Structures are given as C-alpha cells and as structure tokens.
Amino acid sequence: MKLRANRVGEQMKKELGDIISRKIKDPRVGFVTVTDVQVSGDLQIATVYISVLGDEEQKENTLKGLAKAKGFIRSEIGQRIRLRKTPEISFEFDESIGYGHRIDTLLHQINKDGKREE
C-alpha cells in the first residue's frame, strides 16, 4: 500500500505544480515550487510541501491564497487523477531547503577553519 501512496504522491506533485503555476490566478500566489507530497496510506490525506520565493510576508500571503483555492485545487486533482476519493489537501512550508543551506554554510566554515590550522 505504501508503494501506491508514493506513486499517487508523485503524480499529485506533478499535477499540483501545473495547477498552481497555470490555473490559479490569485495575485498572492507567486513563485511557488511544490517540493514534496506525502500521501497517507489510505490515500485520504495529502500534505503538500511548498517553497516560496520571497520574504516571510509573501510566504504567509501565498499560504493564505493556496488555502483559499484549496477546493478548486482539489477538484482539479480529482479530474486529472483517477481515484475513488480525492485526498484532503493541506499545505506546509518545506523547511528542508533552509536547513540544507545552513548545513552547507557550517561545512564551509569548518573547512575554512581546518585549512587555517594547517
């Protein structure tokens, strides 16, 4: 069952990217990238992880715009993917990009400190 949830998640990720970039006309929704979609084992709930280009205010406005368009997005997913029941969608920010950048910065700093000691 987990394999099917992963396949549905990947298909939803592809379709959501298209829907958000082409179909949503809300000016609050700017440069959004769908980074991951986690679907529950029973295919009832989908958590969509997004990254947004901009400051914190733009991120919050984008989240509000996506929440407002949630019904439309869900109906579009239902038309594009053949499932018995379209999963409930929730949007969350993907913090892994910032976390990865912080780790990269720390590794570069450690590398510089190591070269100074030699």
Curated annotation (Swiss-Prot):
UniProt GO MF annotations: ribosomal small subunit binding
A Pfam family that the UniProt record links to this protein: RBFA
Compartment(s) of residence: Cytoplasm
InterPro entries documented for this protein: KH_dom-like_a/b, RbfA, RbfA_dom_sf, Ribosome-bd_factorA_CS
Main location: cytoplasm
PROSITE patterns named among the record's database cross-references: RBFA (PS01319)
GO biological process terms on file: maturation of SSU-rRNA
Known role: One of several proteins that assist in the late maturation steps of the functional core of the 30S ribosomal subunit. Associates with free 30S ribosomal subunits (but not with 30S subunits that are part of 70S ribosomes or polysomes). Required for efficient processing of 16S rRNA. May interact with the 5'-terminal helix region of 16S rRNA.
Protein name as annotated: Ribosome-binding factor A
Organism: Bacillus thuringiensis (strain Al Hakam)
